[in-house]
A protein has these predicted regions:
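Alpha/beta-hydrolase active-site loop
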Residues: 38-61, 448-452
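Short amphipathic alpha-helix adjacent to the substrate-entry channel of hydrolases
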Residues: 4-22, 98-108
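C-terminal GPI-anchoring signal of eukaryotic secretory precursors
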Residues: 459-474
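Primarily recognizes the serine-hydrolase "nucleophile elbow" in alpha/beta-hydrolase
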Residues: 57-142, 224, 229-247
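Short, surface-exposed "cap/lid" segments of acyl-processing enzymes
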Residues: 1-14, 30, 405-415
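Short beta-strand element of the alpha/beta-hydrolase
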Residues: 1-4, 70, 397-398
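C-terminal catalytic histidine-bearing segment of alpha/beta-hydrolase fold enzymes
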Residues: 131-135, 173-272, 398-405, 414-417, ...
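Long, low-complexity, polar/charged, intrinsically disordered or flexibly structured peripheral segments
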Residues: 190, 194-377
Length: 484
């Protein structure tokens, strides 16, 4: 991507008027368009870590407290913000930082660190090692169109990915806020399923309590997808706000009318006017009414390498193919079930494509699976993985997501929230009803709410806190803050 062509004070004024310094370092995207300038994982996060190290190297001549750095991001930027929060000082990044020319030691010879204090993540696209399976369990299993048409190879793969996700949930043993281990006894039964249903109901009930009627539903703009060589937006947080207007709208005069619209195909929402709360019949009914699958089977690691994530794990210098497969779970299914799959319609053999890609090494000698681990927050947070407790994780996280989105499964963000909470971190998690893949907030402005969250953290830690000494740094998509 090219650098932004303009900087506009109005896009960052909300931060500056609060005494926050907005640092705009920039970072590589998934592809630079140049064979001699590699991008993708883990260079995007490496660039941001390098920026933090630069600021800390120069902390004596720059304003701000470099122990109070916050990041933020939306979508892929939300993932990078999360990674900045989770991967602090991870040794896995050392060789990349050195190749990047990052500051590794200060003038006195002390190691410079790249950990941060807090991360804001809107709709983070994370946990790519299981994202294909999570998408099929959360969304794909409930549909029978396109690549999920019955009696096709891809439908069979979808079913098997769904089963793999059940195995993963039972292996990772996440706990709910009450400390109960969440498991699946069958595909759609068990405490994990019940917890997801509870999250959906809480999101709906938040909407009911937050919303005044008459209420107008406005179709939202999609999050902008920058092409391989497109320009970054002007200086600022980026990403669409909660209610971008696409020109289509529907007004509901009463809450009862809105509930009736949800039940227009079948009754799956029950509203109790006495308690002003609602319940749902099942996750399936919610998904079928509120979410349409926008991705084929292989939602992130596409069988034909057609997704943006395939380019994230590509290698620019490999001119024959700068997109790579990265999902070992999908590969194992293709390999183990090939005889079953090849008897079905639409079959194509992708086994060699996967096996060739997964072990392709980059310029520092790391293969694709190593790079997937580096870009998987839960790799550092769960004892299911070898990376458990090998990084300095931020103390504070704020994760907001639109529960109607089809860009990723809701369970990906829920798993991230639970893993951080189980790790002992302070996490605010909000899944917002009637919001899609946007900077989702229950109420108010996303930037203002983010700033308020930071101020609340700093007030708690400093009784004499004042915005006059609230000094911070940010960057586009994933952004850096400093505070005094």
């Amino acid at each position: 991507m090219s650098a932004p062509t303009s900087n506009d004070y109005s896009t960052v004024s909300a931060y500056i008027t609060e005494g926050i310094i907005f640092a705009y370092s920039g970072c590589r995207g998934r592809y630079t368009g140049k064979e001699d300038y590699v991008a993708g994982a883990p260079w995007c996060v490496t660039d941001l870590k390098s920026a933090i190290r630069y600021l800390r190297y120069n902390k004596e001549i720059l304003p701000g407290d470099t122990d109070k750095i916050y990041t933020f991001g939306m979508s892929g930027g939300g993932a990078q913000s999360c990674l900045m929060g989770v991967t602090g000082n991870s040794d896995l990044y050392t060789k990349y930082l050195e190749e990047n020319g990052a500051a590794m030691k200060d003038a006195a010879g002390n190691k410079i660190k790249d950990n941060v204090k807090g991360s804001q993540c809107w709709c983070p696209i994370t946990n790519l090692d299981t994202a294909n399976a999570a998408y099929e369990w959360n969304i794909g299993q409930y549909f029978s169109t396109d690549t999920r048409t019955p009696d096709t190879f891809t439908k069979s793969l979808s079913d098997d990915l769904t089963k793999k996700f059940v195995e993963y949930v039972n292996d990772i043993r996440l706990k709910d806020p009450k400390g109960n281990v969440l498991t699946l006894t069958e595909t759609n039964k068990g405490s994990y399923y019940d917890y997801l249903k509870t999250v959906i109901e809480q999101s709906l009930n938040n909407f009911i309590s937050d919303t005044s009627f008459p209420w107008t539903k406005v179709a939202q703009k999609e999050f902008p997808r920058f092409d391989d060589f497109g320009d970054l937006p002007p200086l600022g947080p980026g990403g669409p706000e909660d209610s971008g207007d696409s020109g289509e709208s529907t007004t509901y005069e009463t809450l009862e009318e809105y509930i009736a619209s949800l039940n227009s195909d079948k009754k799956w929402v029950t509203y109790d006017s006495k308690t002003n709360t609602a319940t749902i019949t099942s996750v399936e009914d919610f998904v079928k009414k509120c979410i349409n699958p926008s991705k084929d089977v292989g939602a992130f690691d596409d069988l034909k390498r057609a997704q943006g994530e395939n380019q994230v794990f590509g290698t620019n210098y490999d001119t024959d193919n700068n997109k790579k497969h990265f999902d070992e779970m999908t590969y194992s299914l293709l390999n183990d079930n090939n005889d079953k799959y090849k008897a079905l319609s639409d079959y194509a053999n992708y086994i060699n494509d996967f096996s060739n890609d997964l072990y392709k090494v980059d310029s520092v000698g790391k293969n694709v699976l190593d790079r997937v681990n580096m870009y998987n927050p839960i790799y550092y947070l769960s004892d299911h993985y070898n990376g458990y407790k090998t990084s300095d994780v931020a103390d504070y996280f704020r994760i907001n997501t639109g529960i109607f989105q089809s860009d990723t499964g809701n369970v990906v963000e829920i798993n991230l929230y639970l893993a951080l909470m189980n790790y002992g971190k302070n996490v605010q998690f909000t899944s917002v009803w009637e919001q899609q893949h946007v900077k989702a907030e229950r109420t108010g402005d996303s930037d203002a709410n983010f700033i308020q969250w930071i101020n609340e953290i700093e007030k708690t830690n400093a009784p004499n806190f004042s915005k006059d000494i609230n000094i911070s740094y940010l960057v586009i998509l994933v952004s850096l803050f400093f505070l005094f």
